[in-house]
Swiss-Prot record:
It is an enzyme of class 4 (lyase). It comes from Nostoc sp. (strain PCC 7120 / SAG 25.82 / UTEX 2576). GO terms for molecular function: carbonate dehydratase activity; zinc ion binding. Zn(2+) binds at H127, H129, H146. This is Carbonic anhydrase. The keyword Metal-binding applies. Predicted to be exported by the Tat system. The position of the signal peptide cleavage has not been experimentally proven. Residues 36-264 form the Alpha-carbonic anhydrase domain. Pfam families: Carb_anhydrase. Gene3D superfamilies: Alpha carbonic anhydrase (3.10.200.10). Belongs to the alpha-carbonic anhydrase family. Reversible hydration of carbon dioxide.
Length: 264
């Protein structure tokens, strides 16, 4: 089977557009979202996002929302090498950190990417959530890392990686040590490099489905790849983030009629 035909069949299973569909609104709308006060608790919390702005309507009425509870019994297996389906090429980049008041975000310089079914997505940034946003059979993890990518046509792909309490994580500590404490500030450190590949789990088995951004405006048709194997961070490292952001995770959303595929 040709790579193009394989990609067409896989994306059809996921219920996503096959070729040429731009998700550029997913990229530009979060900038507009900054002008609307939203958060994770109270009257600006997730259950009210759809009421805060017409731009946020999908947060309330969308049918392909993220995160979801990944129910293993309902997942469809694809017996294809996950390493062939999802290929990453992440290079070290100068550390550029932002504390935007919602999370800690690391912006990435051009040149790093992933390929999903032979479609290339450039790594734009990664950020963290506490607790995890996705669940696996109801299991909640301590944190979740999201690596956000965009193709030349504007398509978005996000890789989710669970973090659980365990061994000290030296790459994470580089970020924690440099994180600005004041909200709305950023820091660029040219002589310190960060390498996103250090966050990838040793096993590349992953779940994939068509979802959305997990923050307003909750734009849909985002390709999600959630790694099945968590990585570790020390309890102290998890505690440091949770002190800054006690709760910055959106609750799970209905799966509706979507299909979740596991690449094994």
């Amino acid at each position: 089977m040709s790579s193009t035909l394989y990609r067409r069949q896989l994306l059809k299973l996921l219920g996503m557009s096959v070729l040429g569909t731009s998700f550029s609104s997913c990229v530009t709308s979060p900038a507009r979202a900054k002008t609307v006060n939203w958060g994770y608790i109270g009257k600006v919390g997730p259950e009210h996002w759809g009421e805060l702005s017409p731009d946020f309507a999908l947060c309330q009425i969308g049918r392909k929302q993220t995160p979801i509870d990944l129910q293993i019994a309902d997942v469809k297996d694809v017996h294809s090498s996950s390493q062939d389906l999802l290929v990453t090429n992440y290079q070290p980049t100068a550390l550029h950190l932002i504390n935007n008041g919602k999370t800690v975000q690391v912006n990435y310089q051009p040149g790093s990417y992933l390929k999903y079914a032979h479609q290339k997505f450039e790594l734009l940034q990664f950020h963290f959530h506490h607790f995890s946003e996705h669940r696996v059979d109801g299991k909640l993890y301590d944190m979740e890392l999201h690596l956000v990518h965009r193709s030349k046509s504007g398509d978005l792909a996000v890789m989710g990686i669970f973090l659980q309490a365990g061994a000290f994580n030296p790459t994470l500590q580089i970020i924690w040590d440099a994180t600005p404490q004041n909200q709305g500030t950023d820091k660029r450190i040219e002589d310190i490099n960060i390498d996103a590949s250090q966050f990838l789990p040793a096993q590349h088995r992953f779940f994939t489905y068509s979802g959305s951004l997990t923050t307003p405006p909750c734009s849909e048709n985002v390709l999600w790849c959630v790694m099945a194997t968590p990585i570790e961070a020390s309890p102290a490292q998890i505690a440091k983030f949770s002190q800054m952001f006690p709760q910055n995770a959106r609750p799970v959303q209905p799966l509706n009629d979507r299909l979740v595929i596991e690449a094994i």
